[in-house]
Amino acid sequence: MVVNGETIKFRAYEGIVYVKNSIDAEYEVMNIYVPEQYYQNGNIDGFTAEMAPIFFPNQIGGYMPAKPARPELKRPRGPMAENAVQSPNAAEVALSKGYVVASAGARGRTAANGKAPAAIVDLKAAVRYLKANDKVMPGDAEKIISNGTSAGGALSSLLGASGNHPDYEAHLKALGAANASDDIFAVSAYCPIIDLEHADMAYEWQFNGVNDYKKMSVTMLDYNVKRELVPGTLTEAQKALSDKLKPMYPAYINSLNLKDAQGRTLTLDQNGNGSFKDFVTGFLAQSAQQQLDAGNEVKADWLTVKNGKVTAVDLAQYAQTAGRQKTPPAFDGVDLSTGENQLFGNADTDKQHFTAFAMNNSTVAGATMASAQDIKMMNPLNYVGDANAKMPQNWRIRVGTNDRDTSLAVSAVLAVKLQNHGAKVDYALPWGVPHSGDYDLDELFAWMKQLSTQ
């Protein structure tokens, strides 16, 4: 393959079943790619066969089943990518820079055997396979760097936060996963759809009062396929749900006892204002300022700019301009209509609730609630700071300023909670970028290189 004018030779080992007791042989497989130079005792950019980090990208979108990635020409991942030029995907770029690439497929919500926590268990099993076989294959399994977008970004985050945690052990044993650890070296996550049990509140904290929406067609949740926006206006019943959800978020934020870099506690008052809101808007200001400093024009009716400096961000106006994409509740639908409802189903029931709020307001007769343990095992925030989890030191999180798939607050909480527990977090909101991933591969691999050679 040719990357940036350079021909890349590599060996491909595809369709490797990474568990002994495979439940879904179509998805519980891994593709491994190794630069050819490593078989000739060569080195690439300072890496050798023994010490090359392992790049571990997943292709999961919408918590759907996903096959492993292959090195190929592709468009960036996301809804705005149909018109983008095809270029080498992350796996291909990784090979050109000397990384061993291992990409695992995983089960997903549309199958009875792919409900929570199947996808994260599969990714952990794949990591264990790499660790167990470290001595007999190129690449350093103590330097696994995961990467994913949207639900894949959530699972990349969860893989990092929950390393070696005993919660998953019974599931891994049942699959016949290798007897090895599953902690990883670093996490890259684009627009992670996490903290699902609080994401409905977060969405209304940001979008309450924005009553027109453009909703993504539910059949198009997998970000590898074309998505369709359907316009509409909230009903009175939906507005009432939004009004109930918004004031629930401050109590949750205040319960986390988050602190900024100066040690100040991040809080919200009963109206949703406060230091946490300022913390979130600070990242929007930072993104705009970078554009201004680079000499680019910044047009946004929610920004105040004086003498080339951003002086204020109006989050309510930002929400109006960005536009609502989901109807309340955004994730746990009272009619059990969301992809996340299907994620939290089980072998007997395709769709279930996973918040008390939606359960109490359910419009579906006989609706049931997912188990507390399954809900816990899908949220990285539940494992950050848990002494039973081995968490990586290094994290890179990116969410575009045009992303409306979840509240900006969600990724901000992840970033600051990680920092509060000693992690180094590179967190930013790239200007004008929608819900998408792998759009800044030069920067991603520069970050990975710096970590890997420390």
Description of each model-found segment:
Residues 1-48:
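Catalytic-loop region of hydrolases
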Residues 22-27, 32, 162-173, 180-181, ...:
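Mobile cap/lid helix-loop segments that gate and shape the active-site cleft of serine hydrolases
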Residues 30, 44-63, 67-74, 145:
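Short beta-strand element of the alpha/beta-hydrolase
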Residues 54, 92-107, 145:
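A fold-wide structural signal in alpha/beta-hydrolase
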Residues 71-101, 173-174:
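Short amphipathic alpha-helix adjacent to the substrate-entry channel of hydrolases
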Residues 114-136, 446:
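Alpha/beta-hydrolase active-site loop
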Residues 132-210, 375-376:
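Primarily recognizes the serine-hydrolase "nucleophile elbow" in alpha/beta-hydrolase
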Residues 199-205, 239-306, 396-403, 410-415, ...:
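C-terminal catalytic histidine-bearing segment of alpha/beta-hydrolase fold enzymes
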